[in-house]
Amino acid sequence: MPVKKKRKAPGVAAAVAEDAGLKKCKIPSYCRSQPPARLISGEEDFSRKKCLAWFYEYAGPDEVVGPEGMEKFCEDIGVEPENIIMLVLAWKLEAESMGFFTKEEWLKGMTSLQCDCTEKLQSRFDFLRSQLNDISSFKNIYRYAFDFARDKDQRSLDIDTAKSMLALLLGRTWPLFSVFYQYLEQSKYRVMNKDQWYNVLEFSRTVHADLSNYDEDGAWPVLLDEFVEWQKIRQTS
């Protein structure tokens, strides 16, 4: 989960693919090597008091974990801010804004996860990652990411943020992602609305990589119609 300071789009890290004659498309990694979590003796019960004290290690005077606190939190748990596990954690906490955790979000989410310290959260990493492999949970995470990442005074995602979030969510699983990314790079689109965002996931799950089963008369957004047309022209040129 990228840490927002001035609501700039998160960086796009880890290379995905390079199309002939076109620039490389890069995406962030799913995970980095994690330091081994210390064993927690005796299956300790969850402590709300301990969880709250843990929260205040990172929160500011406004009782919110902001960008600086988030960076320290990520460092302590051994996860890069742009790692997808941070997005899954934010989803579990039902965090409203990227780069911020309120006290209410922290307590509700960490109580659900039964985590009141760094070691317990590290022991839940495999569970958090497993949510990405569940079709229903992944769809919920994907949809959550739209509102999580957008500026709250805007109804749409700016295109740079959309590209970065799509890279994080679909970059390793959708065969056409690098091509779609290149299409967005050269397109006229400067924002992506919620309907377009939702349909990109459906498109990635149902349309073949060669586009052979794409229904031009289907109820796809114009953005995807234009993408298919653009790609077919490239394939025949």
Curated annotation (Swiss-Prot):
Domain DCUN1: 46-232
Cross-referenced InterPro entries: DCN-prot, DCN1-like_PONY, PONY_dom
Swiss-Prot/TrEMBL keywords: Cytoplasm, Cytoskeleton, Nucleus, Phosphoprotein
Positions of modified residues (Phosphoserine): 41
GO cellular component labels: cytoplasm; nucleus; spindle
GO MF, one example: cullin family protein binding
Any Pfam family matching the protein: Cullin_binding
Localisation: Nucleus; Cytoplasm, Cytoskeleton, Spindle
Changes after translation: Phosphorylation at Ser-41 is independent of cullin's interaction. Phosphorylated in response to both TICAM1 and MYD88 dependent Toll-like receptor (TLR) pathway activation. Phosphorylated in response to IL1B stimulation.
Predominant place of localization: nucleus
Known tissue expression: Highly expressed in testis. Lower levels of expression in skin, thymus, spleen, lymph nodes, lung, brain, heart, skeletal muscles, kidney, liver an ovary.
GO biological processes: DNA damage response; positive regulation of protein neddylation; regulation of cell growth; regulation of protein neddylation
Record text on subunit structure and interactions: Part of a complex that contains DCUN1D5, CUL1 and RBX1; this interaction is bridged by CUL1. Interacts (via the DCUN1 domain) with the unneddylated cullins: interacts with CUL1, CUL2, CUL3, CUL4A, CUL4B and CUL5; these interactions promote the cullin neddylation and the identity of the cullin dictates the affinity of the interaction. Interacts (via DCUN1 domain) with UBE2M (N-terminally acetylated form) and probably with UBE2F (N-terminally acetylated form).
Free-text function comment from the UniProt entry: Contributes to the neddylation of all cullins by transferring NEDD8 from N-terminally acetylated NEDD8-conjugating E2s enzyme to different cullin C-terminal domain-RBX complexes which is necessary for the activation of cullin-RING E3 ubiquitin ligases (CRLs). May play a role in DNA damage response and may participate in cell proliferation and anchorage-independent cell growth.
Swiss-Prot/TrEMBL domain comment: The DCUN1 domain, also known as PONY domain, mediates the interaction with different cullins. The DCUN1 domain mediates the interaction with the N-terminally acetylated NEDD8-conjugating E2s enzyme leading to the NEDD8 transfer from N-terminally acetylated NEDD8-conjugating E2s enzyme to different cullin C-terminal domain-RBX complexes; the neddylation efficiency correlates with the DCUN1D5-cullin and DCUN1D5-E2 interaction affinities.
Alphabetical list of PANTHER family matching this protein: DCN1-LIKE PROTEIN 5 (PTHR12281:SF6), RP42 RELATED (PTHR12281)
Protein name listed in UniProt: DCN1-like protein 5
Organism: Mus musculus
Gene name tied to this protein: Dcun1d5
